[in-house]
Design a protein with these regions (language model features):
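Extended, charged/polar low-complexity intrinsically disordered regions
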Residues: 1-71, 75
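Outer-pore/vestibule module of multi-pass helical membrane proteins
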Residues: 66-70, 79, 95-99
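Walker A/P-loop
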Residues: 82-120
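Short, contiguous acidic/charged loop-to-helix segments that flank catalytic cores in large enzymes
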Residues: 67, 120-121
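Hydrophobic/aromatic-rich, well-ordered segments within soluble, folded domains that form packed cores
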Residues: 75-81
């Protein structure tokens, strides 16, 4: 199921890029997608989104269910990664049950990083 969800999102992104006429790699519609690159000089993977760059964490979390990625999720990914890139941190806020925690966990999973959730209201 994880691969189907990821492939469906990739298909939707490609369709959107074609419809919007994106032809250059420096256009924001392409830059705002989370992409993985191999750095042969360091022999390691890095993730890039907009002007933020992160090393892949290699934290294997299994092949569990993935979040269905929507355009809003893509916007949250850009916002969160830009904040982290600027060393500002990220604290999603909003009504209960809207996917803040799951979106954060999914971004951490895509980056190969561990995500620990603490519920201080219980």
């Amino acid at each position: 199921m994880c691969m189907i969800t990821t492939d469906a999102h990739s298909r939707d992104i490609i369709d959107k890029l074609i419809v919007e006429g994106v032809t250059q790699p420096d256009e924001f519609q392409w830059q705002s997608q989370l992409k993985c690159y191999f750095d042969p000089t360091k022999g390691d993977f890095r993730l890039k989104i907009a002007d933020a760059e992160f090393w892949y964490g290699y934290e294997y979390l299994g092949n569990g269910a993935r979040l269905v990625v929507t355009p809003l999720t893509d916007r949250i990914y850009v916002t969160a990664t830009q904040a982290l890139h600027l060393k500002m941190g990220c604290a999603p806020a909003g009504p209960a049950g809207t996917g803040k925690t799951e979106t954060t966990k999914d971004l951490a999973s895509a980056m190969g990083k561990a995500c620990y959730v603490f519920n201080c209201s219980d």
